Amino acid sequence: MATSYTPTHVHLVGSIGLGGVDEVFGTVGRALGRRLKRIPDGEPGPRRLWVSFQYPLLRSSPFLRPDPSGALRKTSGFPLLCLAEGVKADEVEFGELGYAREARGSYLDFLAARDRGDVAKGTRFQVCLPTPMSVIYAFCTARDVAAIEPAYEKAMAREVELICRHIPHSDLCIQWDVCHD
């Protein structure tokens, strides 16, 4: 005997194949309503391919260089990066990663969507962040991951601090994405 089931809560992982933040909040917010306890911005634009938008940032770092072997990451086709010649692990540092900037902009769109009634009151704004290991593993040689990842982790911690400073905790949900593309 078949039974029907209507979910009471729906969780969206992050990426949503719509045209932009306003379309995500409008379409998904209206369709799922109160079943959504949190809603991501859909990771539009340069974030559409998950961590790929971090590659230019890493590639432009003076602490990294393309691996001399010419090896490519099979899944992305990007040249793998390694420590630049003469660079020690404790010298590596990264500046702004862009996640806090993107979150703050999307949060303003979230507020507008909630004010319009597209997103139900009480729904939190979900910020999806990759683990530092996911980013570094995706673009760096295995031999240098352990040397590079701590610096990226520090930069990501600063991003989280900025997100938490600019988005009220009562509106915020942070999801750590643990996977490799």
Language model regions located:
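Alpha/beta catalytic barrel-like cores
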Residues: 1-155, 161-172, 176
